[in-house]
UniProtKB/Swiss-Prot annotation:
Substrate binds at residues 93, 99, 132, 163. One of its GO terms (biological process) is tricarboxylic acid cycle. This is Malate dehydrogenase. The gene is mdh. Belongs to the LDH/MDH superfamily. MDH type 2 family.
């Protein structure tokens, strides 16, 4: 019997990431090649026309798995019955804008979207926040959705994870598929910590394979953490195709499971693991089993790692306090 279409809502659908994402979703790369999808594009009123143009192109691709495209400027309609929500649209930081202003502007987007998801989404809804500051935007959305299990709200650190894989593979002259068990900890920001202490390269310790703490400290970690800024500098625009690719990877693994013997990185509400305060949306090593993320337990955290994880967690705590002071969460 044919599967019923899965409702996938993409916010900021007319933007660059949305454009890089929608065609891949419609082709079956998000959920699998046997799962039809119905796309819902959510945009602000002034971008509806652009979204209509994208919908026309989606039609023109004649994707067999695409059951339809709907366009909305009302979150309540866009999230009604949604199974997968990709929250891409966010208020970007502009010149001279204070971080507090950025958090407040995004609170005005992600609070109402969280409430709309709470009221209308399907029982199995999964939410991925891509729009920055992603961790705290996910925290705000989740705080407005008290009826949905907290771990259904995630923020994307898969792009950082993929960037770290690529840098490590280049250093060791191996394929990215030869590397397992790499981790991004903390915030999707310059304080994030890409951790190779548990990673393996063809079954061997990655740290032993690299054998160069100076490279790890002074090249690898800052290159991964500041890669987004380097791309803006080179391209004149932020990462779009690579961000869309990471979103596809994140949801695909969430729905279909992570490969045996490996894990990935996801920011999700902490359960207190590894000393990260409960409820804080922080990146962890995770596996996906039966459609749910589980934090990998029992990893030894050395002093080098502890210091860096704690620094990123402190930043997340500061962001949480800032949005609490603004009345965006309780």
């Amino acid at each position: 019997m044919a599967k019923a279409p899965v409702n996938v809502t993409v916010t900021g659908a007319a933007g660059q990431i949305g454009y890089a994402l929608l065609f891949r979703i419609a082709s079956g790369q998000l959920l699998g090649v046997d799962t039809p999808v119905r796309l819902r594009l959510l945009e602000i009123p002034q971008a509806i026309k652009a979204a209509e143009g994208t919908a026309m192109e989606l039609d023109d691709c004649a994707f067999p798995l695409l059951a339809g495209v709907d366009i909305y400027d009302d979150p309540r309609k866009a999230f009604d019955g949604v199974n997968v929500a990709l929250l891409v649209g966010a208020r970007p930081r502009t010149k001279g804008m204070e971080r507090r202003d950025l958090l407040e502007a995004n609170g005005g987007i992600f609070g109402p979207q969280g409430a709309a998801i709470n009221d209308g989404a399907a029982d199995d809804v999964r939410v991925l926040v891509v729009g920055n500051p992603a961790n705290t935007n996910a925290l705000i959305a989740q705080a407005h959705a008290p009826d949905i299990p907290a771990d259904r709200f995630t923020a994307m650190t898969r792009l950082d994870h993929n960037r770290a894989l690529s840098q490590l593979a280049a250093k060791l002259n191996v394929s990215v598929s030869d590397i397992k068990k790499l981790t991004i900890w903390g915030n999707h920001s310059a304080t994030q910590y890409p951790d190779i202490f548990h990673a393996e390269v063809n079954g061997r310790s990655a740290v032993e394979a690299v054998n160069d703490e100076e490279w790890l400290r002074d090249t690898f970690i800052p290159t991964v953490a500041k890669r987004g800024a380097a791309i803006i500098e080179a391209r004149g625009a932020s990462s779009a195709a690579s961000a869309a690719n990471a979103a596809i990877d994140h949801v695909y693994d969430w729905v279909n499971g992570t490969p045996e013997g490996d894990w990935t990185s996801v920011a999700l509400p902490s359960d207190g693991s590894y000393g990260v305060p409960e409820g804080l949306v922080s990146s962890f090593p995770v596996v996906s089993r039966n459609g749910s993320w589980e934090i990998v337990q029992g990893l030894e955290i050395n002093e080098f790692s502890r210091e860096r994880i704690d620094a990123s967690v402190r930043e997340l705590e500061e962001e949480r306090e800032a949005v609490r002071a603004l009345g965006l969460i309780k």
